[in-house]
């Protein structure tokens, strides 16, 4: 589903931060200011958003993995929901340093979480003392909260999608270090540097955040559907080809 300028306006994507907090590197994307608030130029945002979604579609069509990152209160819920709908990993609690650059260690924690889930399923809690069971549950809840969204991520992702690049500076730095492309919502108070696909826009309004996140999830599902369609059509084309024997 394509997003329109009207939808962006209605979601308040154009409202930036107070002018005194601005980052001059965002000047090319700023339309002006009203009541000491910077107004983002949506005529720049819309094509840049579309460009990012085109990249997301292509990546999804090639079975790529996109890690959704949004740990702020107003983005957590919708981000986890939409990443789940698109079948992609996500980080909605705190970003743990080394989540990308030290994925080996993170993998150990993922294995621990999966083992604990399997043990619980097999009824291991019934053989534990009350105290042991409580400690077990606590550890499992803690692990689920911090890495539950990435437990099916087999390795580092092919790209990351970040809502508020300043708030998630560590995630962006880790991705840059590993050469992982970054799709990022950048507000007027942050720098677009290090972001491969910049989406200049409001990163605080829950309506605006929902618009970006749904857009990315839709693009992933479209990319996958297009890839399946191409395979079906290619197979159909092969069936229709009949070799004629000569003589």
UniProtKB/Swiss-Prot annotation:
Coiled-coil ranges from the UniProt annotation: none
GO cellular component terms attached to this protein's record: cytosolic small ribosomal subunit
Entry GO MF terms: structural constituent of ribosome
The family this protein is said to belong to: Belongs to the universal ribosomal protein uS2 family.
A Pfam family that the UniProt record links to this protein: Ribosomal_S2
Keywords carried by this UniProt record: Ribonucleoprotein, Ribosomal protein
GO annotation, biological process: translation
Alphabetized InterPro entries for the sequence: Ribosomal_uS2, Ribosomal_uS2_bac/mit/plastid, Ribosomal_uS2_flav_dom_sf
Protein name: Small ribosomal subunit protein uS2
Disulphide-bridged cysteine pairs: none
């Amino acid at each position: 589903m394509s997003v329109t300028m009207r939808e962006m306006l209605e979601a308040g994507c154009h409202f930036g931060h107070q002018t005194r907090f601005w980052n001059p590197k965002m000047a090319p994307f700023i339309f002006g200011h009203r009541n000491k608030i910077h107004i983002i130029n949506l005529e720049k945002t819309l094509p840049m958003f579309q460009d990012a979604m085109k990249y997301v579609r292509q990546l999804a069509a090639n079975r790529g993995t996109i890690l959704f990152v949004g740990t702020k209160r107003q983005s957590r819920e919708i981000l986890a929901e939409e990443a789940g709908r698109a079948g992609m990993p996500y980080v909605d609690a705190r970003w743990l340093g080394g989540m990308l650059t030290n994925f080996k260690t993170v993998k150990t924690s993922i294995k621990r979480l999966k083992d604990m889930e399997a043990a619980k399923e097999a009824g291991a809690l019934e053989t534990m003392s009350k105290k042991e069971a409580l400690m077990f549950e606590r550890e499992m809840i803690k692990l689920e909260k911090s890495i539950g969204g990435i437990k099916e991520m087999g390795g580092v992702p092919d790209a990351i999608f970040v809502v508020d690049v300043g708030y998630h500076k560590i995630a962006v730095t880790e991705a840059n270090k590993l050469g992982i492309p970054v799709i990022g919502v950048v507000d007027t108070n942050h720098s677009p540097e290090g972001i491969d696909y910049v989406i200049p826009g409001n990163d605080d309004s829950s309506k605006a955040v929902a618009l970006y996140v749904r857009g990315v999830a839709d693009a992933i599902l479209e990319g996958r559907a297009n890839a399946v369609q191409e395979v079906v059509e290619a197979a159909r084309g092969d069936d229709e080809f009949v070799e004629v024997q000569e003589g």
